[in-house]
Every structure is written in C-alpha cells, then in structure tokens.
Amino acid sequence: MKSVLASGALTLAFSLAALAADAFQASSWDSTHIIRRDVVIVGGGAAGTYAAIRLKDHGKSVVLVERRDRLGGHAVTYKDPNTGGSVDYGVQVYDNNTVVRDFFSRLNTPLADLSFASFGKPVYADFEEGMLLNLTAGTLGQDYINELNKYPYLDNGFELPDPVPEDLLLPWVEYIGKYNIDLSTAIATLARPAVTGNLLNILAIYVFNNLNHLLLHEMSGAVVVNANRDNSQLYRNAVSELQPDLLLRSRVVAGQRRTRKRDGVRLVVDTPTGRKLIIAKQLIVGMPPILDNMRTFGLDSHEHSVLSHIYGLPYYGGVVSDTGLAPGFSFKNYAANTSYNLAEIPSVVAFNPSSVDGLFYYWYNAPQPVSQRRIETEARDAIKTLQRLTNSTTQPEPKFLAFSDFAPYQLRVSAEAIRNGFYDDMYGLQGHRNTWYTGTLFVTGSSQVWNNTEVMLPEILAAVNSS
C-alpha cells in the first residue's frame, strides 16, 4: 500500500513539475483558453472593481479575476424576500466626494444623503454580565486633532519619515496616557466603527491612519449611501459592465512575472469553464496581499520577505430577524468593569437596525477565527439577554438570515517591521515585476481605496503604454 501511495505522490509531483515547466507557453494551450489583455486584476472588491472600470475608461483592455461568485468584497447585502428591501451588513457609507460621486454615476447607481440618526439611538449594555449601562458616547476633541495633525502623511497611506516616530509604534492605550488624551476623546477613538482586534493594543499608527481627516469629514455628516440602501447594486452593475472580461469563482494557480516591461505577466487561472492562461502587460493586486493569497504568483525572495509581514484579523457580520428588540435602537456591547468599558473579545460588537423593519445586522470581533455556529449561538444568547433587559413584550427565537466572514480584515504589520522599513519596502514593490498593489493595505474604507487607486492610475497607464 505504501508503494502505491508513494507512486501516486511521485506522479503528482511530476505533474506539478510539468505544469511549472510549460504552463506559461502559449503554444501549450488551446487558443480558446488564452486571454490576452493590457492589465489583469486579481481581487474584485472595492479596489479591483474600481481599477477595472477606470482602466476601461482609459481605453485599456482588462480581465478581472475574483474567487467569489460576486464582486464587492466587504459590500455585502441581504435581500429580504418578503419586502424586497435590502440590508447592508458590511460597508455602510461613503465619503461625499467627487471620486465617489463619479464612480456611482459611471455605474448608473443612485446616491442619497444620509442622516446618522438612521443608525439608531444607542443603547449600551454588558452582553456578558446581562446589565444595561449608563454610558455617554465620547466626543473627539481638539486634543485628538492636534495629535492627528502631527502626522499628515497617514491620511492617504504610510509614506513615513525615516526614522519612523516611535510614538506611532506605541499601543494606542499607551499613546493615550503619554499625551493625556481626554477621557471623552479616548472613548470616541475606541468607538470608531468596524475595527478589529484588541482596540487598546492597536498601534497608534493604525489609529491615525484609520481615524484620519477623511473619516472625520464623514463623521461630520458628509456621507452618502446607495439610494436604495443596497451597496451591492454598484457591484452588480459593474458585473454587467465588465462582462465578458470577468472571471468569477476563479483562482490563480501559477504565475510568471518578469522584470522587463516587455515580458509582462502570465497567470494560470482555474475557472468554472476550465483552466486559462492570462497574458497581460501589467498586474494589479486588489486582494489582500497576505502571503497565503500570493504564494501562487511566483514570488521572488524579496517579495516573499516583504509580504510575509502582513496579517489581517477576523471580523464577521450577519443579519438576524425575530429579535424582539425595539426598532430604531442600536444595541452596543460594552463592559461594566473594564478599561474604557470595552467588551472582552471574542464577542458581538452591536446589533444595529436596518432599513427593513424587523431586521437587524450585527458585527462580531475576534482575535482568532471563530466558527459561524459559535458566533450565531453567542449572538442568539445576547439577543435573549437584551430581550430581558429591555422588557421586550415578545421574546421570539432569533432567525439568522445571512452571514459573512470579512477576514483578513484591516491589514497590519508589527511595530518591529514598521521600524525596519516595511512600508518603504512595500511601496518599493509598486511596479516591480510589472505588478501593482492597491486596496486596504494602505487605507481603510472604499472611499479612500478608490481615491488612492485613482492616484495610482497614471503610473500604471504609463507602464502599460511602455510595455
């Protein structure tokens, strides 16, 4: 039996070797399985979709590769079969700026202004201990603005001075103490939406990069939403626009990227209609460039060394009905007896009202991966606790309607890696081996991702034109 297994393993090894040897030669492929484009884009979230549309607008041919069966990344939407209404339980809002408005207009998707009141009046509760809390929402004060203004280069990425200021590498709780940040301000910085991990231990550099001047602009009320409260509509329209230059449910299984521009890139991609060879002048990586996502791209030793530092954390979201909770309220999980009343993780972050009566969406923060079953069990227990605490007139059994795993979420690297020049090295990879990186490695939020991608386009176009 062992000899049979060994023989099978040897055959597999030879098969993989054969793939590596001639997989990138067009002569080895049926012409119907070869795709030739100016640019191949891998990752169909906010970054990749925007890049594909804008490159088409500039007259370039593209192919977009996405492993899921849809575009949109963290823009996830539940469609209620009873009312036809939509519940966004990932991306919520966009900055009201020209790039955002132009992109929505380009894809014939309506926008509308938003009142933050639609997110519900906050109710603070300790989900674990089962008690309502008399808390006051923090307010960002001038003390935070003064600190943020020290680091203007963090608004649009991480083009850092050398040496990197050591203050930026402090855990946020230590930065708060060192600069005597007011309690109300500190609480506000810890209450920013959809942040993963232990909020006190996040490096200051990531707080300022996330809670930057653009986000402050949004928090002042300068936000827009899809007029139908369906953030996935933008991406459905993008699917229609990009066909047939779109490969959904597809994965890169091998890559060859040369250093000379004229040699371009070649990717072997598994698709629902068979394996394809993509031959392109340039590659844009719009997905999280963590090592596990990039191993099949034929990394050189320098790329491997740089990308190996990147990690993301778990974050989850879902939609639930039959909660028995009062409409128009946002039920937030805090703790009675911890620093800044932060709830321990893993735990549900909040239950928020949606635009569909009776449906709430929730988020769940965890330091390590957690199963959907455990998350929904804990969410169910929290809802039953809230029913009791709020004297709900009905106590139905919650029904879970949708679930999404957003990992790897909010990409980061260690303080030591930053100190040793990680971001200089990462920016140095732009254009290296005809490959470009965009997305949430540099900024958070779709609005900034689109803006940063737009800023990169002239360099990418120049590379295409000179290939």
UniProtKB/Swiss-Prot annotation:
Keywords: FAD, Flavoprotein, Glycoprotein, Oxidoreductase, Signal. The gene is dbaF. GO terms for molecular function: oxidoreductase activity. The keyword Glycoprotein applies. Glycans are attached at N96, N134, N337, N391, N451. Induction: Deletion of the conserved eukaryotic csnE deneddylase subunit of the COP9 signalosome leading to defect in protein degradation results in the activation of the silenced dba gene cluster. Expression is positively regulated by the dba cluster specific transcription factors dbaA and dbaG. Expression is also controlled by the transcription factor flbB. Coiled coil: none annotated. This is FAD-dependent oxidoreductase dbaF. Its cofactor is FAD. It comes from Emericella nidulans (strain FGSC A4 / ATCC 38163 / CBS 112.46 / NRRL 194 / M139). Gene3D superfamilies: 1.10.405.20, 3.30.70.1990, FAD/NAD(P)-binding domain. The keyword Oxidoreductase applies. Its EC number is 1.21.-.-. It holds the Pfam family NAD_binding_8. FAD-dependent oxidoreductase; part of the gene cluster that mediates the biosynthesis of the antibiotic 2,4-dihydroxy-3-methyl-6-(2-oxopropyl)benzaldehyde (DHMBA) and its derivatives. The direct non-reducing polyketide synthase dbaI product is 2,4-dihydroxy-3-methyl-6-(2-oxopropyl)benzaldehyde (DHMBA), produced by condensation of one acetyl-CoA starter unit with 4 malonyl-CoA units and one methylation step. The FAD-dependent monooxygenase dbaH is responsible for the synthesis of yellow pigments derived from the oxidation of DHMBA. The roles of dbaB, C, E and F have still to be determined. Disruption phenotype: Reduces the amounts of DHMDA produced. Pathway: Secondary metabolite biosynthesis.
